[in-house]
Amino acid sequence: MFINKDIVKLAMKKNNIATQTELAERIGMSKSQLSQMLSDDFCPIKTNVLNLMNELKIPFKELIIEETGEHMEQLELITDESIANNINRYEYKLDRYTDVKNISPQKDYTVLETFAGAGGLSLGLEEAGLNSIGAIELDKDACKTLKKNRPHWNVIQGDIVNIANNGIKNHELFTLDKELDVLSGGYPCQSFSYAGKRHGLEDIRGTLFYPYSQILNELTPKVFIAENVKGLVNHDEGRTLETMLDVFSQSGYTVYWNVLNAWNYDVAQKRERIVIIGIRNDLIKKQKKPFAFPEISTTKPVLKDALKNVPDSQGTPYSEKKKKVLELVPPGGCWVNLPENIAKDYMGASYHSGGGKRGMARRISWDEPSLTLTTSPSQKQTERCHPSETRPFKVREYARIQSFPDSWKFEGSVTSIYKQIGNAVPVKLAKYVGLAVIDYLNQF
C-alpha cells in the first residue's frame, strides 16, 4: 500500500502549490522526508496495523470504517470527485479595466447595503448614482452617524443574523416592491468549517458571510458587491475565498474579484481591499459587453492634498513617553531612524523578530500618501504620526484621508469615531466601483 502520487500532484495544482519543497514547508517536514513519503517503498500504514489486516483478512477501508466510521468523511477529502469540485480562486481574478469617470446612470438603480458601518461604501455608491433603499448595521454609533447624515435612508439597526433568518422582505423598513439592482457590503473575514465535501450554504453556517448569502439568495439582485481586507485572498490558504466563490456560483452568479488600491482611485492612502463582483447569470447571457473594474486614475494625491485646510477636530494624544520617541523620527521615517538603544527599548521583542515592521514609530510625510489607517490612531505596530506635529491624526484628518467630505458628521465617542472611520471603505474608491457597476447595468 502506498500514497497515490497522481492524486497528490492534482491536489497540489488545485491548491496552487508549485513544488514539493513548498508542500513540505506547509506540512512541516523536510523535502527529503516528503520524497520518502511519496516513494514506492513507503507504506503509510504502520506495521502492526498491516499485521492486523493480514491476520484478520480485513481490507484497510473496511477496517477504518469499522473502527473510526465517524471520521470517514474526512478521509474522503482525497478522492477524484472532491478534488474535481475544488476551485482555484485565481481563475476568478479579473484583470479587465475600463474608464468610468464620465459614467452616469441611465436608470434609477437601487442598492441595499449590509454591514454599512459609518457609510463609506454607501456614500461612495450614492455619489456614483445608486439610490439606497436600506442600510443594515448593528453598531449604535454607526447607525446614529448614518441617520444624522442621511435622514431619508432606511437605516435598519439590528443583528443581520436575525434579519436574514426572519427574511429581509419581512422587515418593516424594507419597502422595495421591485427587483433590487445591487446588494453591497463588507462582511467580516472568518474561517469556515469543512466537512470534506462542499455543501454550499451548509459550509458557512456560524459566520457573518452566511446572512449575507441568505439575503443574496432571498433578493437575487442583478449585481452584488462584496469588499474585504486584502488578506482574504490567502486567508486559510485560500480556502475561505474559494468557499465564498463556490457559494456565490451555486447561488447563480458569475463572480469576479480583484485587489484595488485606494491610492489608484483619488484617495491619499495606500489601502488595499479585495472587491468581489457577482453578476446574475441571466444578465451574463444577455450582455453585450462584459464587466470591467474601474481604470486606474492618473491622479495620485498625497497627504498635503488631502489635509489642505482641514477643519480642527477632536483627537487622541500620545503618551509623553511615546511623544519623546516620535519626536526623533523625521517625516517619512520610522523606527529605523531612531538611535539603536531607543529603538530596542521602544520595540521590545519586535526589534529582533525580523521582517519590515516599517509601521512602527512611523511618521507620514506631506509628500506621500498615508499608510492604511487603522481603527486606533496610536497602535504601536501601525502608527501614523502627523508630518509636522508629534501627534496622531485627528478625527477630521482621518476622515479626509478616507475621502469623507467635511460635511459628513460622525456620532459617538472619539474612540468610536476613530473606529468607524478606520473600518470604512474609502468613499472615492467606493464611488469608482459603483461607477463600474453602473456602466455594466446601463447596457440593459
Which stretches of residues belong to each language-model region?
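DNA major-groove recognition helix of helix-turn-helix
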Residues: 12, 38, 48, 56, ...
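Core alpha/beta nucleotide-donor-binding catalytic domains of modification enzymes
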Residues: 70, 74-220, 230-234, 239-241
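DNA major-groove recognition helix of helix-turn-helix/homeodomain DNA-binding modules
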Residues: 46-62
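A short, Lys/Arg-rich alpha-helix, primarily the initiator
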Residues: 1-18, 26
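Residues within the helices of the helix-turn-helix
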Residues: 21-22, 50
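Recognition helix of helix-turn-helix/homeodomain-like DNA-binding domains
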Residues: 28-44, 66
